[in-house]
Amino acid sequence: MSAPLDAAPATDPTARHDGLPRKTASAAGVDPDAVIGFLDDVEQAGLDLHGFMLFRDGAVAAEGWRWPYAAHRPRNLHSVAKSFTASAIGLAVREGLLRLDAPVIGFFPEFAEEARQPGLEAMTVEHLLTMSVGHESETSGAVWRGIKTSWVREFFKIPLAHAPGERFVYTSAASYMLSAILTRLTGQTMHDYLKPRLFEPLGIAGEAWDVGPDGVNPGGNGLVATTADLLKLGILHLQDGAWQGRQVLPPDWVRAATRAQGPSAGYGYQWWVYDDATYAGIGKFVQMVRVYPEHGAVLAVIGAMKGSSRLVPHMNAHFPAAFGVSNPDAAKDARLAARLAAWQHEDAAAPWKAPFQAGQTPAQLRRLRFTATDNAQGITG
């Protein structure tokens, strides 16, 4: 097991705005050539990877962002936000605010009469966590956001096609209800609840979370954060909930959340679980934080590609095989540094990306026209 994360000293020149210490890849026991191979494979496959951070042996061992993306620029996170939601529920359980076997409808008695249907009273908080509420199909975040009335009321209107706990059906509606329950219990949004308990202890700042019609954070998406913030959530779980000497999350919760639960062998409590003893939070367009407990490593990636299944084979081809280098190698580290520098700047000089003078007067600006190539959204300009 590699070294735990310690606070970076204020004078540590390797620490950046995120407060995480840095090492060269080989000093952290990572093969620099494997990282180069990963980037080369992704590029040759035509995958749009925007940035990544790799943590091992108590420090960030490699990182890079492709222009115009950068470390300090936050992203609108999709379903990877669910893993933050799981942390909030774990904290609420520790504080005695709720039990996993508590019926969901019990938190919203005002909907009990209109929501009456067989099986509903058997649906528990744990069924929300494990995506086994009994629905026939997914309710995506995009569908959810089109609803202008109470999302809680709409959730209880969805028919139960299966007994709760019987079948895994991935749905962002379940994550929303976890957030709604927390807000009902605390009077706070999940974001405000997590601020002093998770975000501030981890040095996460500048984050934000959307709010739905009920005054509730979506839970399953809508969190705005950086790649480093994703990495920190993974590091926290790698370390059984400990962060720089403080037990931020209960260790038993971390272990429960990141192993298979409910009817699916590949899903825990809002975390995806793999056969190779790794686990990951995953969001649309390949927003992922993957934890390698047996190797003391965490990999966070941000991209714009359809389906994580396109990137995962390239990850698996190089990680965890890259871990376990025993001797620092300055020459290999220099090759990696050069590759990352080229990756970061290779598009910056493209002629079509150069700044241009749009005009200085209102009349000139009104003459500007922008057009778009064919796209699924039907945007023409």
Segments (PLM) and residue ranges:
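Active-site Gly/Thr loop motif
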Residues: 251-301
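Active-site SXXK
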Residues: 58, 75-101, 128, 178-182, ...
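Structured C-terminal helix/loop/strand segments within mature extracytoplasmic catalytic/sensor domains
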Residues: 2, 283-352
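Active-site helix/loop module of the DD-peptidase/beta-lactamase fold
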Residues: 76, 95-133, 157, 188-221, ...
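Active-site-proximal alpha-helical segments within enzyme catalytic domains
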Residues: 174-181, 219-242, 287-304, 316-318
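N-terminal leader/targeting segments and the immediately adjacent pre-domain N-terminus
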Residues: 1-75, 91-99, 130, 328-372, ...
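A small/polar active-site loop signature that marks catalytic segments
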Residues: 134-211
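Structural helix-adjacent loops and short alpha-helical linkers that scaffold large soluble proteins
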Residues: 31, 96-100, 138-139, 183-195, ...
